[in-house]
Design a protein with these regions (language model features):
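Conserved N-terminal beta-strand and adjoining loop/helix that marks the start
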Residues: 1-24, 91
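Residue-level preference for beta-strand/loop junctions
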Residues: 5-7, 34, 84-86
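Active-site-adjacent beta-strand/loop module that shapes the phosphate/pyrophosphate-binding cleft
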Residues: 17, 74-98, 130, 134
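Conserved Nudix-box catalytic region and its N-terminal flanking loop in Nudix hydrolases
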Residues: 21-60
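Hydrophobic pocket-lining residues within nucleotide cofactor-binding pockets
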Residues: 31, 43, 74, 94, ...
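Structural detector for helix-capping/boundary residues
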Residues: 41, 55-56, 68, 110-113
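A short coil-to-beta-strand element that immediately follows conserved catalytic motifs
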Residues: 63-72
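NUDIX/MutT-family hydrolases
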Residues: 89-91, 99-132
Length: 135
């Protein structure tokens, strides 16, 4: 009998900045898969998804975020080329200037009409859902 496998739990944080839903923080990944991404990462053992979201946001952008609400869960088995993940996506707000840290090679604030490419994972779909008001 084969051993059961389970998806890894991750979190992604859509960080609104400058008091606007039109401006968000994105990171350029330092490691594969390459591209721009919504800040986020794996939930560590003993940590809630909310704690993981706040930790990952700070680790990658240096920003202290205020979580506003849970947005959606994205769990397509093909969403991450490294393996099956399920991501709890949050909407958060922050003040200040983001600074790239940890596994982020670069961090920038983008207006919804000027998003970079390529985007990693399924983050283009997540942002499309967010900006279209898919709640």
């Amino acid at each position: 009998m084969s051993e059961k496998r389970f998806p890894r739990l991750t979190t992604d944080i859509i960080i609104q900045i400058r008091g606007s839903q039109e401006h968000i923080v994105l990171v350029k990944r330092k490691f594969p898969p390459e591209g721009w991404a919504i800040p986020g990462g794996f939930v560590e053992y003993g940590e809630t998804v909310e704690e993981a979201a706040q930790r990952e946001a700070q680790e990658e952008t240096s920003l202290q975020v205020q979580l506003l609400r849970q947005f959606h869960v994205y769990s397509d088995p093909q969403r991450d080329p490294r393996g099956h993940t399920a991501s709890v996506v949050f909407i958060a707000s922050a003040e200040g200037v983001p600074v790239a840290q940890d596994d982020a090679a670069e961090v920038q604030v983008f207006h919804r009409d000027h998003l970079p490419s390529p985007m990693a994972f399924d983050h283009s779909q997540i942002l499309s859902d967010y900006f279209s008001g898919y709640y």
